[in-house]
């Protein structure tokens, strides 16, 4: 697997703040400040990748703001607007048993106990009570709560999720 294939999009640069190179970040993470756990970021736009090192970061009024080493003025910061933020998957903290990163579930094939393919996980959504798998396939979109009552196994090696879910639900 190449370095590019092993990176996960975690958000994007949505704008600048001030005149000293600070950037506003739209994070696609549960907690926006969790991006501050990763000192090295890859910024990607139009096939171009720029590797940057995080110098500082803070959350201001629920908005993540960051400063990169070597980006010291508004013009340089502005040139990074619209770049997608990617982090190497191997930089993620290990998960506990029966705990998964959403990015690891997206793309997995979901089958039911009868081995009928329900489709592939296209996304997940947070409902407050639990996460829900959004599955797209030939049967249309199917939503399955990601709880042990319905999810029997998650095999990350074979990329198959087995669910106790019928086509008539």
UniProtKB/Swiss-Prot annotation:
PRC barrel domain segment(s): 97-169
SUPFAM superfamilies, alphabetized: PRC-barrel domain (SSF50346), Translation proteins (SSF50447)
Keyword DNA repair attached: no
The keyword Chaperone is annotated on this UniProt entry: yes
Residue pairs linked by disulfide bridges in the UniProt entry: none
Oligomeric form and interacting partners: Binds ribosomal protein uS19.
Note on domains (UniProt): The PRC barrel domain binds ribosomal protein uS19.
Family, per entry: Belongs to the RimM family.
Name this protein carries in UniProt: Ribosome maturation factor RimM
Organism of provenance: Neisseria meningitidis serogroup C / serotype 2a (strain ATCC 700532 / DSM 15464 / FAM18)
